């Protein structure tokens, strides 16, 4: 099951007692800040959580899986996420008994 923005807003509403509309706007604003920073070419560091980085990938050869035809995969910029040590530790601890 995936955590959605709506569920995050609902959690803010329940734990902080703020208006649902305000909670939704807070969640949207948070992600908009991250999007804006990445669009500007900035790294996003969330202490205790992880880092969002931009990585340039070079053009490389590829293959159309349907036809088998060789086609170039164009150069592009991708977003990567590297979890912080605190997040890694908590996830490992949560999954240790499974």
UniProtKB/Swiss-Prot annotation:
Residues 49-71 are annotated as: Disordered. Keywords: DNA recombination, DNA-binding, Transcription, Transcription regulation, Translation regulation. One of its GO terms (cellular component) is cytosol. Coiled coil: none annotated. It comes from the Bacteria. GO terms for molecular function: DNA binding; structural constituent of chromatin. InterPro entries: Hist_DNA-bd, Histone-like_DNA-bd_CS, IHF-like_DNA-bd_dom_sf, IHF_alpha. Pfam families: Bac_DNA_binding. Gene3D superfamilies: IHF-like DNA-binding proteins (4.10.520.10). One of its GO terms (biological process) is regulation of translation. PROSITE patterns: HISTONE_LIKE. SUPFAM superfamilies: IHF-like DNA-binding proteins. Belongs to the bacterial histone-like protein family. Heterodimer of an alpha and a beta chain. This protein is one of the two subunits of integration host factor, a specific DNA-binding protein that functions in genetic recombination as well as in transcriptional and translational control. HAMAP family: IHF_alpha (MF_00380). PANTHER family: DNA-BINDING PROTEIN HU, INTEGRATION HOST FACTOR SUBUNIT ALPHA. This is Integration host factor subunit alpha. It comes from Shewanella sp. (strain ANA-3). The lineage of its organism: Bacteria, Pseudomonadati, Pseudomonadota, Gammaproteobacteria, Alteromonadales.
């Amino acid at each position: 099951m995936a955590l959605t923005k709506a569920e995050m807003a609902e959690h803010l509403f329940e734990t902080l007692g703020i208006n649902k509309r305000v909670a939704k706007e807070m969640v949207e604003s948070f992600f908009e800040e991250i999007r804006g920073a990445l669009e500007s070419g900035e790294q996003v560091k969330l202490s205790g959580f992880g880092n969002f980085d931009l990585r340039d990938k070079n053009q490389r050869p590829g293959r159309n899986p349907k036809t088998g035809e060789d086609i170039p995969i164009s150069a592009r910029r991708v977003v990567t996420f590297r979890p912080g040590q605190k997040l890694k530790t908590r996830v490992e601890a949560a999954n240790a008994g499974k």
